[in-house]
């Protein structure tokens, strides 16, 4: 989306007469990107859909809180990240599994998921990513899958670029170690 388009969209979102139509455009424009960001965090298609409903509901109900000093996509990504992390925290509190069961669970769940179109290596990568701490997982996903610049991630996660680079490199090392152990 160009800067001019974004500015126009922000104006439409601010105007009660055009707000609904503008928000529908936001959903069309960013919905798929947000879905895949959420899906990489929560892994399950059904869980991702549930989180996405919360993301869109929160975005709609908090339109007045949107400060136009950042891009719409950055604001939406932040909501998606927070909702995904909240979901994962709630899920962790509900289900306690051993590490061995958890390792089997993610790969098997992904391979059984009709919406997962990856191969066994992709399932193992997701398994390795799932074992990362929340922040490292988030940084890795944003950098690796979304190809975001450190400066964009810094703005999104409200942290320094140096800390992000360290988190990313530690995550890559942990993923590499995971593959060495499971070779």
Placement of each model-derived feature along the sequence:
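N-terminal module of bacterial RNA polymerase sigma factors
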Residues: 1-33, 40, 181
């Amino acid at each position: 989306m160009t800067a001019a388009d974004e500015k126009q969209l922000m104006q439409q979102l601010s105007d009660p007469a055009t707000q609904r139509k503008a928000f529908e455009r936001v959903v069309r424009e960013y919905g798929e990107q947000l879905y895949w960001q959420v899906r990489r965090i929560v892994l399950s298609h059904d869980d991702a859909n549930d989180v996405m409903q919360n993301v869109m509901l929160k975005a709609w109900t908090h339109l007045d809180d949107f400060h136009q000093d950042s891009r719409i996509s950055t604001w939406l990504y932040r909501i998606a990240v927070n909702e995904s992390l909240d979901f994962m925290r709630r899920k962790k509190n509900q289900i306690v599994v051993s590490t061995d069961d958890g390792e089997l669970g993610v790969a098997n769940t992904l391979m059984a998921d009709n919406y997962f179109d990856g191969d066994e290596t992709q399932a193992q990568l997701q398994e390795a990513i799932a074992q990362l701490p929340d922040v490292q997982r988030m940084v890795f996903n944003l950098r690796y899958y979304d190809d975001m610049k450190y400066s964009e991630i810094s703005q999104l996660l409200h942290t320094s670029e140096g800390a992000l680079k360290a988190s990313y490199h530690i995550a890559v090392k942990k993923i590499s170690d995971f593959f060495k152990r499971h070779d």
